[in-house]
Structures are given as C-alpha cells and as structure tokens.
Amino acid sequence: MTARTQYSARNLLASARSGHADWAPAWTDAEPKARYDAVIVGGGGHGLATAYYLAKNHGVANIAVLEAGWIGGGNTGRNTTIVRSNYLYPESARLYEHSLRLYEGLSKELNFNIMLSQRGVLTLAHSRHDMDAQSRWANAMRCNGIDAELLDARQVRELEPRLNFGGPAQPARYPILGGFIQRRGGSARHDAVAWGYARAASALGVDIVQNCEVTGFTTSQGRVTGVDVRHQGRVGHIQADKVALAVAGYSSVLAAKAGLSLPVTSYALQAMVTEPVKPVLNTVTMSPALGAYWSQSDKGEVVIGGALDHFPSYAQRGNFDVMQQVLAATCEMLPSLGRLRLLRQWAGIVDVVHDSSPIIGPTPVPGLYLNCGWGTGGFKAIPVGGWTLAHALATGRAHELAEPFQLERFHTGRLIDEAGAAGIAH
C-alpha cells in the first residue's frame, strides 16, 4: 500500500505557494510483475473499479490492471457521461440503482471530485403511446423504490423552455405531450471517474500497467493460468490465479483467445459536441422516439448523442448517416442550436448482447471472469460493475445483484430483455 496526498482546500492553498509543483503523481505507473493473484484486463472505469473494490472490500493485495493504451482512453473517455437508474425490470433497476447510489458518495470515498451533477434525466413523450409506455415505466420504477415523476407538457416546458413545442401557426413536427424525469439522474465527469478509481486503487497497492496489451492466455488442464502480453514493445507472460476481462467492445475478441464464444456484437456508438454557449439546457434530455439526447457540459458545450450504427464495427469513428439523423433531430427539437458549429465527433465501441443486459461473473472457462455486455449503459454502471465483479473474483460466486446476469442465462432462456427501458440506442 502506498501513501497518497489528501486532496483538500487546505492542501490546495498550501500547494499554491510552490506553484502547485509539489503534488505527487495521482497513481504509480507500475512495471508488471511475473505473478498476480488477479489480473484485470482493461484500464477503463470498470477495470479500475474492480481493482479498487477487490482490494478495499475483499483485502486482495496482489492485483494488476493491464491497459493496452492509457488509463480511461477507451469507452470511459468516449461516452456522454450520463448516470441514471431509470430501468424497467426489477433486476436491472436494482443493479443500476446500486450504481447510482455508489456514484452519489464516490467523490467523498475516492477523495476525488467526479463532478457529479444530478440535474435530472428527462425523457420526452411525443404521442399517446409514448405517454402510456412512460407511465408504465415510471410506475415500475416507483415500485422498485426508484424516484420517477410523470410530467405533462406544461411541466416539461417549465423545465426546458427551449424545446420546440410549436404553436397554432406552426405546429411542432414532433409534439411534446409530456414525459417523465428521474431527478437524481444527471452526469459525472468521465475522466475524473477513471482517475479517481486509479488513484484510490494505486494507494491500496494495485499495479496499474499502461501500454500493456494482452495478446493471449495460457492455460493448464483447461484453466486460465495467465496472460501473454506486449508491454512497451516487449513480449512477455504474466501468471495469475484469476483473470477478468473488462474491455467493453473487445470482449468477444479476447474471450475467443481463451476458447470462449460470447453472444456479443460490437457496434460504434458516436457522439459529438458543439462550441460552448451560455446555459441552454437544464437537464439531460432524451427523445427515444427521435433517437437523440442532449446535455450541456460545465464548459458550455452541448453534448449530443444518438443511436448505434447498426453495422458491426471496431472503428472508433462514426459515419455521416447517423450524424445526419441525430443532428436533424437536434435541430427539430432545439431549433435555437441550429447555427452552432460542431467542435468534434467521436465513437466508442459498445458490446451489445441479445437481451440488452450485461454479463458479470464466472465463465465456463475456469479462472476467467467477465464484465461485459453493457452496451450503451457502461458508464452509468461503472461502480456496480466493479463492485459485483470484485465479489465474483474474491469468492468465485456471482454477487446477488449479478445473479440474473450470468452467461448461463443464454442457455436457460432466463433473459432480461431491457431494450424497452435502456434509453436510446438499445
């Protein structure tokens, strides 16, 4: 275990005397050892959270997180930063609500400001069918003990007056009849979440190894016993009692190297941001019918997200067809943004399974564990993904929250078809 500097206003002011030149690195960039009790492949939010909770909650000290690039450089740094727990089925609701509750205390626990902004997640309804579906959705959330509030058109207008409600002379193409809001939902800074977990895990003795690509697995009598790696141009091998995969869209590729075929398809999910403007959005606003959603960053950029590109891909870039669809929806719903310029556009590779629910826990290959299948919901699930995978690594059994999300459900048929409540893309 390594000591870390306590972040506080007092220390911030004290460090100002030296021009902030005396801060220690947030985490140690380690060299890999020959053997670990647990190796976690993937240095994004889920991998780092798993390492942190495995060390903190279960006392496992000899852990490595192996990242092919840099910490948080994959999907964790490519999402639209939304956190919410507005899911329909009880199994999903319990899982994501636990994650949101962990988020609510994460800045204090990690001693790192994740910039959580619980501004509310507003979902729009454009038809009577939408209103009926959202009434069912919100009622299910309340039955599961999660906050949800149905809104009429007047209440939506009070929350987001810049939405296009139309008028007698020019009715809106997509009329807004109402919607519902989860007021505890909102956004968090993605880089801060990754860095906070990395810093806290490193302080507990976890080795964080960047630029270390896992190229294969070693096995003995059918059991995974380690990983083959390429670290800064050097080829090597690391032994491990247990290996966990937390690599999002690359899960099926790596699992195949261990002889495991996963029901996972990878797609590009793109997003974009505009130039910064004064505050124009008060909430995270979603329109499932239009396949688009919007929020505003602390810097004033309008963050725009949309649907998947439904051609399987591992390319971290989008395409003009999806961009055109999302931007057309944006101009229709928020016409005041129509003359803004885009600053940048990007894509992450998401791992989608048939029932739009994750896979967490042990696999048929002894010694190999999974955290994948989150699809477009990976960022909001970082704390609970790490919490439940750490439990599985420490005990060999699935956490009670993760029991419905085992790989075997695709054999038993006990699927959790969350597509109706998973937001926009799936």
Describe each region flagged by the PLM.
Residues 55-76:
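Glycine-rich FAD pyrophosphate-binding loop
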Residues 175, 179-242:
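Helical element adjacent to the flavin cofactor pocket in flavoenzyme catalytic cores
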Residues 331-426:
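C-terminal catalytic lobe of FAD-dependent flavoproteins
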Residues 80-162, 329-331:
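Dinucleotide-binding Rossmann-like beta1-alpha1 core, especially the glycine-rich loop
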Residues 94-97, 124-133, 180-200, 209, ...:
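Short beta-strand to alpha-helix junction loop
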Residues 33-35, 114-123, 160-204, 307-311, ...:
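Helix-loop-beta segment of a Rossmann-like dinucleotide-binding subdomain
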Residues 52-56, 81-83, 112-120, 218-224, ...:
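Active-site substrate-recognition segment that forms the wall
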Residues 1-38, 53-61, 423:
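Extreme N-terminal leader/targeting segments of oxidoreductases
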